[in-house]
Regions:
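Glycine-rich oxoanion-binding loops at beta->alpha junctions
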Residues: 70-101, 113
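Glycine-rich, charge-decorated loop segments at or immediately adjacent to ligand/cofactor-binding or catalytic sites
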Residues: 65-69, 137-159
Length: 399
């Protein structure tokens, strides 16, 4: 098994720390930022004598990851170091919070999906740092989905928000460090940016191949493969069409409802010729959240080949299947979705066009799956400029 060294390892255990020596540090991080010995970035910085940790910045879910999605978080302290919440009264650091900081270091485990907000906190921080001539250092970590899968629509400027801040596909196949460099150049941010890359990570790696231990990034992302399923059913959750395993033991890994027929749905989905996935009938009872304590039927989504699996394409077929097999329930649920829910869906998906597809009478699955293919292909060409060469499968260092 590979032993990947993340950016944090290389800064403190590998000697690549000239960018922080003698500096006053602001650290955007949370509980996921640990080195190969399980020591957190916070503790590493607190223990250093050649730099000073003067402020902590916490993203959505809080510094310790215990807050649920959309819960506001107050400022607090860790010892004498202030913890500034970037998911409370404000989502951007203020003048007062950045005062006295020479370098902002960002170390956080992202999940590789545009609508997950950790990347947006990084982008906001970069924009605020450059206004104040503060350097930015990103300590890179793996994309847990992998660095090859690119799927889903781009982001239309109309729907730019905290759950989708830059124009990349819904599943972008980039690390947080690569996204930072993309944002810095393509959006002309021009921050003084340093990315400390990983050593030993390759784009095709499954997270379990890295030798790292997965730390849940938030309450409903408990396992290293959950991000792949978040990319598969998360938008279904925004539409509230059915239960997606949140409130049960398998968040994002299933779809189901009291009005579904498990055998019928699994047969239909398995007949669609989708690559890398199979659907198994499932009977379950959510213990909280959507459809709590109701007997539900649906399917367990089982990815059998991650290299051919396209999560957003599968999501389109799932929506199409529900509309095709249960048209009256589909119509009923969609009729009760208000403007705020529709807007949230459009912000997450990056466009209002998929919502228009859902209103059509015909089967919509493949329309959504193929949506914006040409735009995605153009992005793939641009993306090549920001992929770190050492992460390539065939990379050989110049010696």
């Amino acid at each position: 098994m590979a032993k990947v060294e993340v950016g944090l390892d290389r800064v403190f255990l590998g000697g690549a720390h000239s960018s922080i020596q003698g500096k006053r540090i602001g650290l955007l991080t949370n509980h996921t930022a640990v080195d190969r010995n399980g020591v957190t970035a916070i503790d590493r910085f607190l223990a250093r004598k050649d730099c000073k940790l003067v402020a902590l910045f916490a993203p959505e879910h809080g510094l310790y990851g215990q807050q649920h999605a959309s819960e506001k978080i107050k400022d607090s302290k860790k010892g004498e170091v202030p913890i500034h919440s970037l998911y409370g009264a404000n989502r951007r650091p203020t003048d007062a919070q950045l005062k006295g900081i020479d370098v902002v270091v960002i170390d956080i485990q992202d999940i590789g999906v545009r609508s997950y907000t950790y990347a947006s906190s990084l982008f906001y921080m970069m924009e605020e740092a450059v206004k104040r001539n503060i350097e930015v250092v990103v300590l890179d970590r793996p994309n847990p989905i992998n660095g090859l899968t690119v799927d889903g629509p781009m982001l239309h400027p109309k729907w730019r928000s905290f759950i989708g801040y830059i124009n990349v596909p819904y599943i972008h196949g980039m690390t947080l460090g690569e996204l930072a460099e993309f944002f810095n150049t393509e959006y002309k941010v021009s921050a003084k940016l340093t990315v400390i890359p990983m050593k030993g990570w390759k784009r095709g790696m499954d997270f379990k191949e890295t030798g790292m231990q997965w730390i849940p990034t938030s309450p409903n992302i408990p396992e290293s493969d959950t991000p792949l399923f978040y990319a598969t059913t998360g938008l279904l959750g925004e539409l509230r069409l059915c239960n997606i395993g949140v409130g049960y033991t398998l968040p994002f890994k299933l779809i189901g409802a009291p009005w579904m027929n498990a055998e019928q749905l699994s047969r239909y989905l398995n007949s669609q010729g989708l690559g890398g996935v199979r659907f198994t009938p499932l009977y379950f009872k959510p213990f909280s959240g959507s459809m709590a304590q109701l007997d539900c039927q649906g399917v367990l989504i089982q990815v059998v080949d991650k290299k051919t699996y396209k999560p957003f394409a599968v999501q389109g077929v799932l929506i199409g299947a529900i509309k095709s097999l249960y048209p009256q329930k589909f119509k009923e649920v969609m009729s009760h979705i208000g403007k705020s829910e529709k807007d949230l869906f459009c912000k997450a998906v990056g466009s209002e066009e998929p919502l228009q597809f859902l209103k059509e009478d015909k089967l919509v699955g493949w329309q959504i799956a193929e949506f914006q293919r040409a735009e995605r292909e153009l992005f793939m060409e641009k993306r090549k400029n920001y992929l770190r060469p050492e992460y390539a499968e065939d990379y050989r260092p110049n010696l």
